[in-house]
Amino acid sequence: MQLPDTFTQRMQRLLGSGYESFLEALQQTPPTSVRLNPGKTAAKPGLPKVPWAEQGYYLRERPSFTLDPLLHAGTYYVQEASSMFIEQALKQVIDLEKPLHVLDLCGAPGGKSTHLASLISPDSLQVSNEVIKSRAYVLAENVAKWGSGNVLVTNNDPRDFGRLKSFFDVMVVDAPCSGEGMFRKDLQAIGEWSEENVNLCAQRQQRILTDVWEALKPGGVLIYSTCTWNEQENEENIAWLSEQEQAETLKLILRPEWGITPTHLNGVEGYRFYPHLTQGEGFFMAVVRKGGIPEEEAIGKKKKYKLTLAGKKEQALVENWLQNPEQFVWLQHGEVISALPAPLFDAADKVFQNLYVLFAGAEIAEVNGKKLKPLQGLALSQHLNKAAFETADLNLEQALRYLRKEDISLGTNGSNWLLLQYKNIPLGWAKQVGNRMNNYYPKEWRIRMELPQELPSFTLLTA
């Protein structure tokens, strides 16, 4: 691994006597870690824990995750362990029992968004944003698979959030960066690194922070992170923000065995993850509280709603498909009926009024007259009422062929919608037509790789 000279000199200055151990760690295989979805499984795998994340686990080796149906079912997410430290920021600084408005600004592919969704209360509204459209669709897919039902996925530039003044209690900005912390995982990142790129990244990060700052409530919390080590993109940017705005960094409690390195530069409290000290990739995080006192939201004359409620007839057709249907508001856009926790309606409508929303809540059904088609979002929802449907459990080969959108046969006969499951966790829908079965797995989500002749024995959860 040939590292750039200026990068090497800076890391020697930052790490001192620890530099040789750092270099050695860069030659080692990165650890593989996953985070379970507590809304879908209560399993506790017999695996080493990620100590700062309740649902985080290290795997002994990296399997072919594509060949585990439970990944596609949203039962867990493959996430780098260092970035799970966001959990400590939320738990130590924020009252997670309260209803909150939370923004994940740079959300794709969905690691932090799905993590946030597991930590906040069900009556909190989360907005997960991605500026690049193709990546925003990937984010929406992963949010749908997670199935929490209280997330809106948007496709906006950070400056657009200025329209939502003092709207968010919590903002997560995992800023685009020079990627120094990914060097051992992605050798291409080394080739793309330069001092000029570091400068450009730092300037872009400042623009992003400036663009979204007005949308954070006074007293609200910003969690800022990068996967890089230089001070310019990290502590110096937060010091710059503190000078520009009324803001202070917050100190978190660390356990020595975690191996996380606290930093104190220009009055900024930061947290660094180095691979020779912490079991994870390179990462930086700082937690910032915005100055001022939260204002009571003014109650003015309500503008016309942008969201459209489903009619009573349409609602009656689908409401028993969710557990506790009275807790939801039922929305209709064209032929699609969606569900959103009822307390979130006004806040969600405000987001719809001001941003470009790709995905909201849980998509339940497509209605055409009296014909109903259950949608993939319902199958993967944590609020699905499985008792409303006929279910069929698939073995590993059947599940993977279903996820490849191949025809499968279960030897059944009828004309019902079937909820297909693997290890009792829903994967999606099929429609029986006599002794034939139509596969309704979304084409754009299908597994594209060819299945090996011998399927792997790996599965993260045994039951």
Model-derived regions, located:
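S-adenosyl-L-methionine
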Residues: 129-166, 173
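Conserved class I S-adenosyl-L-methionine
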Residues: 97-108
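Conserved SAM-binding loop of SAM-dependent methyltransferases across substrates and taxa
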Residues: 109-122
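Mobile active-site "lid"/loop adjacent to the S-adenosyl-L-methionine
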Residues: 134, 169-211, 227-234, 256-258
